[in-house]
A protein has these predicted regions:
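Basic, amphipathic N-terminal segments
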Residues: 2-188
Length: 188
C-alpha cells in the first residue's frame, strides 16, 4: 500500500465511520493532523527488501518503535545498512506505520472490529519518529562509519559536517558504481 492510498483509507474511515464516540474514531480524529504532517515529508523509494526488514522489526515489537529495538533487531540478524538507506530509514518507517494504521481502519470499516492496540501503537510510534537517533543508527549499523572515524575532519566535526561527508560518499559511490565501504577504504 502506498502512502497516498493509506492516507485515503484513513480519511475514508474518519468520514464514514458510524460510531464517532468510539475510541478508534477518537484516536484517528485526534491524530489526523499528525498523520498528515508525517506523510507530507515522506520521500519514498521502492526498496522492497528494506521495507520487509523494517516491517518484520515493527511487527516483532508490536508496532512500538524505538531506536534501540531497531538496532538490536538488525544486529541480531547481522544486517547492515548503506549510508543512503540510513537517511531513508525514517521515511520508510513512517510509510509502514501509516500503512498499519490504514489497514486497521480498513478492518474496522469492513468487519466492524480490528486491533485498537495496533492502531494506538503505530500512532504513538509516529509521534516518536522524530526522536530517531540517526547518529546511533549510523554507528551501529553502517560499516562506513568506522572507516569515517579515521578521517580527521569527520571525527571532529558536528552533525552538519558529518552529513556533508556522508552525502559526498553517496554521490561518489553512485557515480563510480562502487560499494561505499570499498571506495572509502581506498580513499582513506
Amino acid at each position: 500500500m502506498t502512502v497516498k492510498k493509506a492516507y485515503g483509507a484513513i480519511t475514508r474511515f474518519f468520514r464514514a465511520y458510524s460510531l464517532p464516540e468510539s475510541s478508534e474514531y477518537t484516536l484517528i480524529s485526534d491524530n489526523l493532523y499528525l498523520i498528515k504532517q508525517r506523510i507530507g515529508g515522506v520521500r519514498t523509494k521502492n526498496d522492497k527488501a528494506e521495507k520487509l526488514r523494517l516491517e518484520r522489526c515493527l511487527r516483532r515489537e508490536g508496532y512500538v518503535f524505538s531506536t534501540e529495538s531497531l538496532i538490536s533487531f538488525y544486529t541480531s540478524h547481522g544486517w547492515t545498512l548503506k549510508t543512503a538507506e540510513v537517511y531513508r530509514l525514517s521515511d520508510n518507517i513512517c510509510t509502514l506505520l501509516v500503512c498499519a494504521v490504514a489497514e486497521e481502519c480498513d478492518r474496522f470499516m469492513k468487519n466492524g472490529r480490528g486491533s485498537t492496540l495496533r492502531m494506538r501503537s503505530a500512532i504513538e510510534s509516529l509521534r516518536r519518529l522524530p526522536e530517531l537517533e540517526i547518529n546511533e543508527v549510523f554507528s551501529a549499523l553502517c560499516p562506513t562509519e568506522t572507516l569515517f572515524m579515521k578521517v580527521k575532519g569527520f571525527a571532529d566535526g558536528d552533525d552538519a559536517t558529518r552529513d556533508v561527508y556522508r552525502e559526498a560518499l553517496i554521490r561518489c559511490a553512485r557515480r563510480r558504481r562502487e560499494d561505499e565501504c570499498v571506495l572509502l577504504s581506498r580513499m582513506t
